[in-house]
Amino acid sequence: MSKFWSPFVKDLVPYVPGEQPKLSRLVKLNTNENPYGPSPQALAAMQAELNDDLRLYPDPNGERLKQAVAAHYGVQANQVFVGNGSDEVLAHIFHGLFQHDLPLLFPDVTYSFYPVYCGLYGIAHEKIALDERFRIRVEDYARPNGGIIFPNPNAPTGCLLPLDAIEAMLKASPDSVVVVDEAYVDFGGESAIALVDRYPNLLVTQTLSKSRSLAGLRVGLAVGHADLVEALERIKNSFNSYPLDRLAIAGAAAAFEDDAYFRRTCQAVIDSREALSASLQALGFEVLPSAANFVFARHPRHDAGQIASTLREQGVIVRHFKQARIDQFLRITIGSPEQNQALLDALHFLK
């Protein structure tokens, strides 16, 4: 701790990102990256940007990407916000759209960046317990609040809240912004973007890190009423007017335009998820229903932390959370068929 740190920094508890090991021989199933590469069209679009124009600043508004997102979802470009990863988009949302006189509501088992942002921006919050099956009870959110945010499908459980339940939540809190964090929605959910024209208090965030295989590019977005998007633009232009570089704008736009590749690779992940779930159940695991590119599983006779350690010794990395309610679960990314088989082979000690 430095004497130059402010009291604010001294008390800050930062987010801990998933491990990015340096050894390439490891089977990496801990951070929910896509086992299939980016769209060839996206790679070609980025390659085309490697020219003398890199001496120039990029489009601060990312209009090409906004137009591609708007066309994909059937919304207007002024309903789309883009940023340097969905974490940055979420940071702007916490900073500019949640009230401070009432608590922000989010699940007790959720994306662990939410409480970090609350600490960073001085936002009071309440964690609402998921039910015994790790599902949101919509009625628990029908209380005075300064905003609501939740991942759908949930991270880390993979459980999905249907659109009719989201709509009920929106109706119950018409004066608060409700943010649906859809990092994993393309692997089995239906996007709440279908509701944005009916509910001015709804904002939906997404990332290109998962279903579009661009985690290394850092591109995220939000879709909602133009008034909400304008607020995010005001914050962006008071913080970093050029959040996306030329390669990111071109590659992300092309990824949205290559719908055939997107659908094919998403379906491959879904098929592998169902196969891996069945294989894990055959080994005695309880596997929660998942609409994401990972499964959340526990074994009734083996400690989750010990399983994770044993797997690591065999070169397979999965995610173990030392958190109440879920400390006996493992979150396992859906890898390639070869990676999934390596995981199952490493679990031979459970037989």
From Swiss-Prot:
> What domain of life does the native source organism fall in?
Bacteria
Q: In which pathway does it act?
A: Amino-acid biosynthesis; L-histidine biosynthesis; L-histidine from 5-phospho-alpha-D-ribose 1-diphosphate: step 7/9
Instruction: Return the SUPFAM superfamilies for the record.
Output: PLP-dependent transferases (SSF53383)
> Which cofactors does this gene product need?
pyridoxal 5'-phosphate
Q: Does the keyword Transferase apply?
A: yes
**Family label:** Belongs to the class-II pyridoxal-phosphate-dependent aminotransferase family. Histidinol-phosphate aminotransferase subfamily.
PANTHER family to which the protein is assigned, alphabetical = HISTIDINOL-PHOSPHATE AMINOTRANSFERASE, HISTIDINOL-PHOSPHATE AMINOTRANSFERASE 2
Subunit info here reads: Homodimer.
Its recorded name reads Histidinol-phosphate aminotransferase 1
* Source organism of this protein record: Pseudomonas aeruginosa (strain ATCC 15692 / DSM 22644 / CIP 104116 / JCM 14847 / LMG 12228 / 1C / PRS 101 / PAO1)
Q: What is the lineage of its organism?
A: Bacteria, Pseudomonadati, Pseudomonadota, Gammaproteobacteria, Pseudomonadales
